[in-house]
């Protein structure tokens, strides 16, 4: 192993600068974060040096500012850097927030990260406001005594008004609406539905494992692709020594266009090499030679949590059993649903079917519950064989228009036949 990777300190530099796995779809908007760090360093350094010469005494404040401008070596540069650096700080911060809004960084699984950013933004505003309260800094003594106090009083007033508004909305309007006949009927129906499905809901709520804090370099796109494929023929491989996990994708030769599409998605996100998967052969049933394609992602430590979610120990023998993770409701996005259809779906009459070979009946029940609860897609379950090792999910033809509308933006041309005449 190279010294830059084995050394404790150099490995940090290596992982962030040299071998940093960045997706190829990244653009210049991602420079805003580092520019914010640069602005912060400038503000801290210039602020510390100016604080060495500034006096907050009302009789000395103005003189100390003039002292910084005239007597301190390059003091005027420090003052102008600090004043204009604050303006650039907020300009870059607003651009950083605009980038996050444009790319949907506030959505799951980045909700917590966005909330922390909002808190940092509010603290930055408060810190900058304290700078304006410095005597004879950027504000006169009169402004300091009057405007500052008025600002704080206004904040208290806004807080009380928002609190009263929230109380009015949540306790008045919603309670009135609840008593209307239509909403009341919907509530009774919802309670009846929950009563009938309380086992599945309880299983979901009690066993759900939150993965949002363990994602690492992942994002919703890569998780949607992986989870959608894992519902079909994809699987996760834990590397020897527990040093990481890779995701393996495999398809028959007849689905070559779909596998190339899947490979291009992952390659563009930077999770696998750009070489096209090669055609391989294997011995099928009755000695028939079958052609297939296969590729895998790089090995990542952050994929370990995906493995732990999808696999449990086999109590009756060696190896692990593939299961449906209880956190799937967070990641069964339209993209994941489209990947599952292209990976494992099959047109049947005016409907669609999914054949599951790895999951138990309870897992398949949970899948149908998610389809109905998340997208209002109705389906039924039947046994695929006598050994109860295979179950088939049939999507009703009444739900096909809904399903088609959800997944159509992600279905490639060679797979549109699976949706029949609805597309």
Swiss-Prot record:
Mitochondrial intermembrane side: 53-84, 137-153
Extra information: Encoded from partially processed COB mRNA that terminates with the in-frame coding sequence of the second intron.
Pfam family, any one: Cytochrome_B
Origin superkingdom: Eukaryota
SUPFAM superfamilies in the cross-refs: Homing endonucleases, Transmembrane di-heme cytochromes
Originating organism: Saccharomyces cerevisiae (strain ATCC 204508 / S288c)
Protein topology in the membrane: Multi-pass membrane protein
Name this polypeptide is given: Cytochrome b mRNA maturase bI2
Keyword field contains ATP-binding: no
Membrane topology (Mitochondrial matrix): 1-31, 106-115, 175-423
Cross-referenced InterPro entries: Cyt_b/b6_N (IPR005797), Cytb/b6-like_sf (IPR027387), Cytochrome_b_N_euk/bac (IPR048259), Di-haem_cyt_TM (IPR016174), Homing_endonucl (IPR027434), LAGLIDADG_dom (IPR004860)
Protein family (similarity comment): In the N-terminal section; belongs to the cytochrome b family.
Cell compartment(s), UniProt: Mitochondrion inner membrane
Keywords: Membrane, Mitochondrion, Mitochondrion inner membrane, mRNA processing, mRNA splicing, Transmembrane, Transmembrane helix
Cited PANTHER family: CYTOCHROME B
UniProt record, GO biological process: mitochondrial electron transport, ubiquinol to cytochrome c; mRNA processing; RNA splicing
């Amino acid at each position: 192993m190279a010294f830059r990777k084995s050394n404790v300190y150099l490995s940090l530099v290596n992982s962030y600068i040299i071998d940093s796995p960045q997706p190829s779809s990244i653009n210049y908007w991602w420079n805003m974060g580092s520019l914010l760090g640069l602005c912060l360093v400038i503000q801290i350094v210039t602020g510390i040096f100016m604080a060495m010469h500034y006096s907050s005494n009302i009789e000395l404040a103005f003189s100390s500012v003039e002292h910084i401008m005239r007597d301190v070596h390059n003091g005027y540069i420090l003052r102008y850097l600090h004043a204009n650096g604050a303006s650039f700080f907020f300009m870059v911060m607003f651009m950083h927030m605009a980038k996050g809004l444009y790319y949907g960084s506030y959505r799951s699984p980045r909700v917590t990260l966005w909330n922390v950013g909002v808190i940092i933004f509010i603290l930055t505003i408060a810190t900058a406001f304290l700078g304006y309260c410095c005597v004879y800094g950027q504000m006169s003594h009169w402004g300091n005594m009057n405007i500052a106090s008025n600002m704080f009083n206004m904040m208290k007033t806004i807080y009380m008004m928002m609190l009263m508004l929230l109380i009015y909305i949540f306790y008045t309007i919603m309670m009135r609406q609840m008593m209307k006949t239509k909403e009341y009927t919907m509530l009774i129906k919802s309670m009846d539905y929950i009563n009938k499905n309380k086992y599945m809901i309880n299983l979901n709520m009690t066993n759900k494992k939150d993965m949002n804090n363990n994602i690492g370099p992942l994002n919703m796109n890569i998780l949607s692709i992986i989870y959608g494929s894992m519902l079909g023929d994809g699987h996760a491989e834990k590397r020897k020594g527990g040093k990481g996990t890779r995701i393996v994708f495999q398809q028959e030769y007849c689905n070559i266009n779909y596998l190339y599409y899947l490979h291009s998605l992952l390659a563009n996100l930077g999770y696998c090499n750009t070489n096209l998967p090669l055609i391989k052969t294997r011995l099928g049933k009755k000695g028939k030679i079958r052609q297939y394609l296969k590729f895998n992602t790089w090995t990542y430590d952050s994929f370990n949590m995906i493995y732990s979610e999808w696999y449990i120990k086999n109590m009756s023998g060696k190896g692990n059993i593939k299961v449906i993770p209880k956190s799937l409701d967070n990641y069964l996005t339209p993209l994941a649903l489209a990947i599952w259809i292209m990976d494992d779906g099959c047109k049947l009459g005016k409907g669609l079917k999914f054949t599951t070979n790895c999951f138990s009946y309870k897992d398949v029940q949970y899948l149908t519950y998610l389809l109905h609860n998340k997208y209002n897609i109705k389906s039924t379950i039947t046994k695929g064989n006598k050994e109860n090792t295979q179950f088939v999910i049939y999507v009703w033809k009444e739900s096909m228009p809904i399903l088609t509308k959800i997944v159509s933006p992600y279905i490639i041309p060679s797979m549109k036949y699976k949706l029949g005449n609805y597309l």
